[in-house]
Amino acid sequence: MRRAVCFPALCLLLNLHAAGCFSGNNDHFLAINQKKSGKPVFIYKHSQDIEKSLDIAPQKIYRHSYHSSSEAQVSKRHQIVNSAFPRPAYDPSLNLLAMDGQDLEVENLPIPAANVIVVTLQMDVNKLNITLLRIFRQGVAAALGLLPQQVHINRLIGKKNSIELFVSPINRKTGISDALPSEEVLRSLNINVLHQSLSQFGITEVSPEKNVLQGQHEADKIWSKEGFYAVVIFLSIFVIIVTCLMILYRLKERFQLSLRQDKEKNQEIHLSPITLQPALSEAKTVHSMVQPEQAPKVLNVVVDPQGRGAPEIKATTATSVCPSPFKMKPIGLQERRGSNVSLTLDMSSLGNIEPFVSIPTPREKVAMEYLQSASRILTRSQLRDVVASSHLLQSEFMEIPMNFVDPKEIDIPRHGTKNRYKTILPNPLSRVCLRPKNVTDSLSTYINANYIRGYSGKEKAFIATQGPMINTVDDFWQMVWQEDSPVIVMITKLKEKNEKCVLYWPEKRGIYGKVEVLVISVNECDNYTIRNLVLKQGSHTQHVKHYWYTSWPDHKTPDSAQPLLQLMLDVEEDRLASQGRGPVVVHCSAGIGRTGCFIATSIGCQQLKEEGVVDALSIVCQLRMDRGGMVQTSEQYEFVHHALCLYESRLSAETVQ
């Protein structure tokens, strides 16, 4: 009876021990159970609930005391990869609630950003131990429907309080290249299962995001192949632009330097050194850099050796020398400063003397004699014949001296500021002088204009001047008022590639200095525009007719002389209607080319009408004596003959009628 009672009690005790229900140390039971099941045993009750909720296969999992049929089926289909995390050795003395070893679960691999998933928690990630990380891993695997071995915890991000993880295929070795794309993983994520399984972690966000290591790796890829090419291309373009700018700058400097050298070469006057000797020394010759011919006399400058006496100038005939080819006269310092010409002088042996002596050169004498005496009178038939021989007219034109003015011959300081072209200057003997604003201001009397003689040498029949500049418009209208000019003829556009003339008249009314200009009427003709103007100064008025001829083409002569001839006839009619008034003002840009053509044609037509013959050569020479360079080119010289021939045919037609 007693044995019968003890046997059931003994069996009960054995079953309880096998079930692990003793209150003592049950670590041996945990190890045996884990070995049989192949799964970690959850310490907490909610962890056991998580284990029950993990469904690897859609069928229900039936458990046995020693094996699991579902696990056997799964193992046949997919070979379970052992966890790569090292497990701590079994130590009975360790408390299961405090297993500290989170570094064993964190892989810290440089995973590409496209494969990383970041899970943000409410729980402090710094307090997660290996047990909680395993729970987290299994919960994520359950939400994804994957095995825990496929979920890898890569990093714990303390600043964001989040866990960085990635998922790998089960049949491949875990590695960076095997990680599944984060977007594909998130599409298969069951949010409800995730929150139910890991409610104690307080998951707030699941998103793909770059990790710090990957960000560093991508930052290191700034100098990638594409980036390197982009930088090289940018630097190449920059170098090319800088090089082009430097080349353009150098070309500009060279161009400006060549212009300065040309100007200096044109303006430079080389004067021979003057030999200074004591009073008793013998005379020495003076050599000029240009020697056209020999002269019978030479000048000696004799100076007191002490430099106290006045210089004595004597003429000797002992030696033949070549005088300077330039006409010189005594000039002072103020005059030299007013000129833009550089002088090269040998002043090494000079004392307190004035070394300049005015001597007309043979070349100047010959040029002036030619201008005064040249003549070729043409009858009407000869005029028609010579027009057909352009080469004869060109040869004749080339023999006419230009008679340009040397800047030193103008005794007005700073006169260059009122010249449109530095080499086109008014002849001093025929220059128009304005009434000065005050006695000491000599510049206010200057304007680049000359009186031009007309038919039969009539004085002041015309005024040839340059196109007004912005700073000479007042001077122009002062000249028109002062000379009481009835007609102004303008033969240029305002701009032909470069500025030729400024708009010096108003649209309706304008005041220029002391002269008020009113536009009364405007008449548009085929080739020119006529404006009737009224000039007022105080209580006095003057009527002026302004002709603006715009049909002259750039850099050549017109194809037909008819428009210019008609303009000349209209101006001549107005001039005759205003007898007793001043000269006709004619200007183009420089005041010598087209201006010379108009005046030469006007004089030649009067000569044809009065005498029946014409001397165009003499007319042009007379114009150049009054203003150098008039009728500037051989083409213009031919054009004058064409205009005269056309006028002659008109006269013949009128005679027949």
Swiss-Prot record:
It catalyses: O-phospho-L-tyrosyl-[protein] + H2O = L-tyrosyl-[protein] + phosphate. Glycans are attached at S23, N129. SMART domains: PTPc, PTPc_motif. Residues 249-657 are cytoplasmic. The modification Phosphoserine is found at S272, S339. It comes from the Eukaryota. The keyword Cytoplasm applies. Keywords: Cell membrane, Cytoplasm, Glycoprotein, Hydrolase, Membrane, Phosphoprotein, Protein phosphatase, Proteoglycan, Receptor, Secreted, Signal, Transmembrane, Transmembrane helix. Pfam families: Y_phosphatase (PF00102). Residues 1-21 form the signal peptide. PANTHER family: PROTEIN-TYROSINE-PHOSPHATASE (PTHR46198), RECEPTOR-TYPE TYROSINE-PROTEIN PHOSPHATASE R (PTHR46198:SF2). Sequesters mitogen-activated protein kinases (MAPKs) such as MAPK1, MAPK3 and MAPK14 in the cytoplasm in an inactive form. The MAPKs bind to a dephosphorylated kinase interacting motif, phosphorylation of which by the protein kinase A complex releases the MAPKs for activation and translocation into the nucleus. Belongs to the protein-tyrosine phosphatase family. Receptor class 7 subfamily. This is Receptor-type tyrosine-protein phosphatase R. It comes from Homo sapiens. The gene is PTPRR.
